[in-house]
């Protein structure tokens, strides 16, 4: 983990204005989006030999409810290429609004939200776009980037949202967007031109949405919402010769599958190693792992990642799971980060807990397991506006602010 370097604590400061989620979203500006797609999205997709398969899409026109997998910075380019020539309104997290500018993101049709909180204004804003702008309305139902190139949990509320919108439900599954730009190795992704493919599938038309129960809509979504980008790479023999392709892999493969030691893994170049037992693996051009000693337990990276999650689940069920650390805290109420100094973070089988000074006042947050379905994690995060280095972090939100927690140890 890296220590945060951004800003001094704001003591005795009045809490800044929070983002107003009640403001109506804007219709995407046609001229602006036309320029952006023509000179950025479409050329890059052409360079990556983009192809999209359309399934059950005959007669399906906007507005529709579009659910897409979330893998990398490539996602929006793929989206616009797949739904060409339409523009869309889309749900975007407040940190992305901050990084790219609130005005610009709203100009492009963005609908701001905070991650993993119940938000009635989001429902109202999505319904407003469907009723007034007649565009596709897009969400990333996983609500975070995939770390291993496979699908994540999708909440059952998605089916209920579809029933409320009363428009067709369409799923976009992209491939190749993760292997060229995994979240633990994002630098120079332009130099990794993996071919990108996608399929756009209508899982329920407007009449079916109104007739089917939310549970059946969720079942249809889950049936289609399946992907594995490392398998896609290996099966299609997509060779990525990037010399630092394994760098950062230890962020997700943090537990040695040979000796079981946690947080002593290291990666650089094309090599992953355990500094406790000395075991080493090579990450091949095709995204596979090969042990230097010839004894490879997990050649497929998602299998190793799944094994780690199963270990954590066993700890939770046994009541022994616990992670605790001192953290540096930054808050993001609207479009600027504010340093809050040091705090304490703990997650165990009882839930997620942290405390800190919050604009000069003592603050605590306690969330039971059923109150927080997931957390958003960033590796080597930077405040793009100030070009300041935050390091590894996670963020947890309440309705009027977001807390970015940077583990110190």
Question: Which stretches of residues belong to each language-model region?
Answer:
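Helix-to-loop junction immediately C-terminal to a conserved catalytic motif
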Residues: 33-70
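A cross-family acyltransferase "interaction/gating" segment
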Residues: 135, 147-215, 219, 240-260, ...
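Residue-level preference for the first positions of well-ordered beta-strands
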Residues: 63-65, 136-140, 170
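Phosphoinositide-dependent membrane-docking surfaces
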Residues: 66, 346-384
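Catalytic core of membrane glycerolipid acyltransferases/transacylases, capturing the structured
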Residues: 61-118, 166
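Long, charge-rich boundary regions
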Residues: 280-360
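Acidic, Ser/Thr- and proline-rich intrinsically disordered linker/docking segments
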Residues: 373-409
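Short, non-ligating residues that shape and space the ligands of small metal-coordination modules
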Residues: 263-266, 283-284
């Amino acid at each position: 983990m890296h220590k945060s370097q951004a800003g001094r604590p704001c003591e005795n400061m009045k809490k800044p204005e929070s983002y107003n989620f009640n403001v109506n979203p804007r219709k995407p500006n046609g001229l602006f989006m036309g320029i952006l797609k023509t000179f950025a999205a479409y050329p890059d997709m052409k360079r990556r030999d983009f192809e999209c398969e359309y399934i059950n899409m005959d007669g399906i026109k906007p507005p529709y409810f579009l659910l897409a997998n979330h893998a990398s910075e490539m996602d929006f380019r793929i989206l616009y290429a797949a739904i060409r020539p339409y523009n869309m309104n889309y749900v975007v997290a407040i940190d992305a609004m901050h990084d790219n500018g609130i005005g610009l993101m709203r100009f492009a049709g963005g609908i701001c939200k905070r991650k993993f909180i119940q938000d009635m204004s989001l429902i109202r804003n999505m319904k407003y776009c469907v009723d007034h702008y007649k565009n596709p309305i897009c969400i990333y139902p996983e609500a975070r980037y995939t770390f291993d190139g496979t699908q994540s949990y999708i909440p059952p509320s998605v089916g209920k949202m579809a029933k409320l919108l009363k428009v067709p439900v369409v799923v976009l599954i992209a491939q190749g967007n993760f292997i060229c730009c995994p979240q633990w190795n994002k630098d120079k992704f332009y130099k990794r031109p993996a071919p990108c493919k996608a399929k756009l599938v209508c899982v329920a038309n407007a009449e079916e949405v109104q007739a089917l129960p939310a549970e059946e809509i969720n079942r249809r979504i889950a049936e289609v919402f399946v992907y594995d980008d490392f398998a896609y790479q290996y099966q299609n023999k997509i060779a990525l010769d990037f010399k630092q392709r394994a760098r950062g892999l230890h962020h997700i493969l943090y537990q040695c599958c040979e000796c079981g030691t946690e947080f002593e893994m290291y990666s650089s170049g094309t090599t992953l190693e355990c500094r406790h037992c000395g075991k080493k693996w090579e990450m091949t051009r095709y995204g596979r792992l090969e042990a230097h000693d010839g004894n490879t337990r997990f050649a497929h990276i998602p299998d190793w990642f799944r094994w780690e999650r199963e270990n954590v689940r066993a700890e939770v069920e046994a009541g022994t799971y616990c992670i605790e650390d001192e953290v540096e805290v930054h808050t993001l109420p609207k479009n600027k980060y504010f340093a809050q100094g040091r705090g304490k973070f703990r997650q165990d089988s009882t839930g997620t807990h942290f405390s800190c000074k919050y604009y000069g006042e003592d603050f605590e947050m306690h969330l039971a397991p059923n109150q927080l379905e997931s957390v958003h994690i960033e590796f080597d995060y930077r405040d793009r506006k100030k070009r300041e280095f935050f390091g590894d972090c996670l963020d947890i939100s309440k309705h009027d602010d977001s807390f970015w927690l940077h583990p110190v140890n």
